[in-house]
């Protein structure tokens, strides 16, 4: 089993999308990259803690490669928007890859370089590629948020 952690705006739709991929064993919504221990959603929404809304993914690398997760990640959001996605703005909504190994770092950066060379997006990619920090699981009401409410999609 391996881990991947991505921030792509509001974590509700991101979590639901990754749950649908074959080889993904579990997905948890949470917060990462900030300076406050055990933050709450209310804390993170102040835009003062430095945390991003993220999903932490447990996946089987024999069934789905990290590159495939990256393809899904870049297809879920606009990685050229700095600190926002759609109507949501603030550093908590930044585009970020928290890598769990030097290999993930290399693969993620090469993936971004390839997307840039292919001119896949009309503006520069601003996605951060940074070492994984402490993942703080979000409150239970954020887990499987769309599923619990019978919603198919979020605004991402």
Curated annotation (Swiss-Prot):
GO MF annotation list: L-methionine:thioredoxin-disulfide S-oxidoreductase activity; peptide-methionine (S)-S-oxide reductase activity
InterPro entries attached to this UniProt entry: Met_Sox_Rdtase_MsrA_dom (IPR002569), Met_Sox_Rdtase_MsrA_sf (IPR036509)
Broad class of enzyme this protein falls into: oxidoreductase
Catalyzed chemical reaction(s): L-methionyl-[protein] + [thioredoxin]-disulfide + H2O = L-methionyl-(S)-S-oxide-[protein] + [thioredoxin]-dithiol; [thioredoxin]-disulfide + L-methionine + H2O = L-methionine (S)-S-oxide + [thioredoxin]-dithiol
Keywords in alphabetical order: Oxidoreductase
Active site: 10
Cited Pfam families: PMSR
GO biological process, one term: protein modification process
EC numbers, comma separated: 1.8.4.11
Function: Has an important function as a repair enzyme for proteins that have been inactivated by oxidation. Catalyzes the reversible oxidation-reduction of methionine sulfoxide in proteins to methionine.
NCBIfam families, sorted: msrA
Family indicated by similarity: Belongs to the MsrA Met sulfoxide reductase family.
Name of the protein described by the UniProt record: Peptide methionine sulfoxide reductase MsrA
Species name: Acidobacterium capsulatum (strain ATCC 51196 / DSM 11244 / BCRC 80197 / JCM 7670 / NBRC 15755 / NCIMB 13165 / 161)
Gene (name only): msrA
